[in-house]
Curated annotation (Swiss-Prot):
The gene is nhr-91. Coiled coil: none annotated. This is Nuclear hormone receptor family member nhr-91. One of its GO terms (biological process) is nervous system development. It comes from Caenorhabditis elegans. Residues 50-69 are annotated as: Disordered.
Amino acid sequence: MDVADSTSETPPVFDHDNLALAAQTNLLQFYLTHLASTLVPPMKLDMRDSMTPSFSQTESPNSETDDSTSAANKVLFSILGTPTTDSTSNAVSKSSSKLCSVCGDKSTGLHYGAATCEGCKGFFKRSVQNKKVYHCSQDNCCEIDKQNRNRCQSCRFRKCISKGMLTEAVREDRMPGGRNGNSIYSNYKQRRSIIRKTKDYVEEQERRPFQSLPSGKKLIKELVEMDCLDRLINLKGLRINPSANCDIAPACKRLTRIGDEIVEQLVEWTKTLPFFDELPVEAHTHLLTQRWAELVLLSAGYYACSVFTPDSPDTTEMIDETDEISFTNPQVNLRLLQNRLSLVLGKEIPLEHVAKEAGPLVTRFTTLLHSFSNLKVSPEAYVCIKAITLLHLSADSTLDRSIIDKVNTLQDHFVKTLQIHLHQPGEDAQTTSLAQILDWLPDLRNASSVLLHSKMFYVPFLLCKNPRRLVFDE
């Protein structure tokens, strides 16, 4: 039956029953497994490849497996290189999670730029918000641990700063006096400058890992040069159906497999990152599995903001023939999605079907676009945010503790690199603060869950890129 002749039946493009593993919580496993039949044999990346196990590259995505994560890991191992250790043997219990970098208590995550417990997080936040200035009676040499962390506030705050906690990351609008308060308390800025000149800090910097990583502008330049945004936006699965009356099935098949193409592009991008060789392959696998949906939305959002001009917040009228995505009106974007989806499929897709299946995703993506456009992110800030997003570990990560430490250290490095960039003077100086960007990241995370639930991974790209203007290197 012609899709245009009926609004009661669900168009094939919205029928996801043919995805054998679509019911799994993490759809990435399906796509990674399917990639095994389409990718070339493992690339020789370095000396570790001499130990490469023989992985099958013909596994069917419909075959049952006792461990879908293991199957997915095999595919990523074949793309990224050889794991240095068995990821299973490196798994640790939740009870052995990372410790607070300030007092050694159990860490609850990354707070203001450092992995800390709730106690040190709250102490740091209150100190900055209340503009406290502490003094030590013991020459600033008090030991700070779980038992005596409350004995000397001065040394505790000093250690917070030395471990990378950022006063700039504390919300300005929660400061006494609201947003009119100073974003960086001058006393803290002065004290931080003094601390960084101390012998202890210099020795700590000399001992820090990842000495091979470039720093500052050089690191950002490498990230900009290696970014795969053009390839990620110009997805082959979004080609226009050449005939207006041809079978809709092949186009639907391309769209349902577009996750393959997305993951492959993200894997290739990961291999170009300056810190690729600093982490074992199982860490890259774990990070991509957790964060690929966020990277999709971030990339599509930045592309839209760099190509289109955000519309007025007062825009409420439906624009029937618009060729631009709206940053404020989900209804405009639903109509845009309907037009472009019909163009790709060669069949008219009823608007009510698009609204029913993609409405929540389009609404959330529009909201995300609006908030992201307000940040006015530069290309340099975008690539830093992208690296920070990839390196964000969940609290229940099962990676080996030593790997978790490395990932957190790397993320800290990119947070500080972003901070330095945001404070660069000049004509192109950023008006956005680090705190504003950190506040936006949870919105990105929440939107990614809607994308995963919808299974329509092509929607952000189809909204941001007119399929008539796709460019391929062939």
